[in-house]
């Protein structure tokens, strides 16, 4: 009887990771479509076509919706938990989180969406490196191997050799530098979140609320100081149809972020970065299956590496030790 009760109590914990993965996958699948539609779409006709260049305003709206959604979650589901995390930690985390998001969105003005996804697929590497160097974490060897396999698999799956000279053909430019900056800041965000999780047992909804509130404050000052707010409002007045996409973009972000912060709190930022990286892979694999697109030999190798990495992580990559603090 006691054993059955123990098994029942562990069932929600076993379901938590699949729920987090499916939540992140579903929300960010649509999020990615909307992001590319907004940032790479052409607005207007003929010679008067315009591009959306308001990365700060887009992320500002995203953070406002995220914060409001987190406040609702706390109000109805998490009102008992007290939050003891220092405000300066939230502020530091929001700065790196913001920088990563703005850099990533800005990169889409210079590189195409697959290039951006491929760059962000390397996210587990800075998260792991900074976890080891700054927080003195010690991961099992299998964890290093599985991260390497997943990142390599995604890279192989998404890589397409250049077919000839074109508008997007370049070696390393401003867009790639922005992606590199975004990856570095992702790693710093992971370090901040790990610190909050280890020292203050910060809840996922409180983390989501406070990081987004600080981000809203910083971005609000930024769009007012640069004058981008007025240019953005003028743009939406000229092309009101974009407002619907931006609001949907914010809602999918808020839902997805609630699953992301839940993953960070229960499983750590490295597991979260593995989930988000794998999600990108499955998004592309789904399009291949649904639309019967052919898969090259290199992509099949990438597919095998991703599943091998996930299998190794599920079986051997659970343990993590701290050597200090």
Swiss-Prot record:
GO biological process per UniProt: UDP-galactose transmembrane transport
Major subcellular site: endoplasmic reticulum
Short motif (Di-lysine motif): ranges: 321-325
Subcellular location: Endoplasmic reticulum membrane
Pfam family, one: UAA
GO molecular function: UDP-galactose transmembrane transporter activity; UDP-glucose transmembrane transporter activity
Keyword Transmembrane helix: yes
Annotated membrane topology: Multi-pass membrane protein
Keyword Aminoacyl-tRNA synthetase: no
GO cellular component: endoplasmic reticulum membrane; Golgi membrane
TM stretches of this protein: 18-38, 54-74, 88-108, 139-159, 171-191, 213-233, 246-266, 288-308
Key words, A-Z: Endoplasmic reticulum, Membrane, Sugar transport, Transmembrane, Transmembrane helix, Transport
Protein family: Belongs to the nucleotide-sugar transporter family. SLC35B subfamily.
Protein function: Probable sugar transporter.
Domain notes: The di-lysine motif confers endoplasmic reticulum localization for type I membrane proteins.
Protein name: Solute carrier family 35 member B1
Phylogenetic lineage: Eukaryota, Metazoa, Chordata, Craniata, Vertebrata
